Amino acid sequence: MREELFYWEEIFYMFWYIDPYYFMLIVPAMLIALLAQARVSSTFNRYSRVYSHRGITAAQVARNILDENGLYDVQVQRVAGSLTDHYDPRSNVVRLSDSVYTSTSIAAIGVAAHEVGHAIQHATDYAPLTLRNAIIPVTNLGSRLSIPLIIAGLLFSAQPLVQIGILAFSLMVVFQLVTLPVEFNASNRA
């Protein structure tokens, strides 16, 4: 009887053991990421109810800043979604989300100006932006695979999968660290 129980304990341990160190590393990082995203959304929502006295849209502000910097070839386009705004250096396009493009709020104007800051960085060959753009493909792959790999590794007690998932997650963290100076600089240029 005891030998049979020992056998089932081994199987349970083999398939369902979760190393607490993984939780100590992953859970805080995930919580920080979620809190940061929640704060961005909360701040945007708060200031999206404060409107510009000039009454011009975020798209118009973006076009004005681009023109003032001689970037006449950069287009401003609308993109679906909320807070999906970005500058695409391959197409030379500033894309503003539905919640930003036609809005006259100071939040939308700030987002549009920030994205134009990236276009200015691109035009002036800002080195950290070049580095960031070079590592984006690897980081995108890591962001899509990290959490599923970690979960699969924990469920099937496959430590190599967990380690690969943690490595992919670490690449995302490095990307965010490289991105911080680029983001601050884009806001300052705006």
Language-model regions, residue ranges each:
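Short, electropositive, low-hydrophobicity segments enriched in small/polar residues
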Residues: Q121, S157, F169
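Polar-ligand-bearing catalytic/cofactor-coordination segments
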Residues: R2, F6-P20, Q37-N140, V174-A190
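Residues within membrane-spanning alpha-helices of integral membrane proteins
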Residues: I147, I166-F169
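Helix-coil boundary and interhelical linker segments in multi-pass alpha-helical membrane proteins
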Residues: M14-Y22, L154-I164
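Alpha-helical membrane association modules
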Residues: L161-L167, P181, R189
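Alpha-helical transmembrane segments of multi-pass membrane proteins
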Residues: A29-L35, G153, A168-L180
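Post-HExxH zinc-binding segment in Zn-dependent metallohydrolases
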Residues: I136-Q159
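N-terminal, Lys/Arg- and Ser/Thr-rich interaction peptides
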Residues: Y21-R39
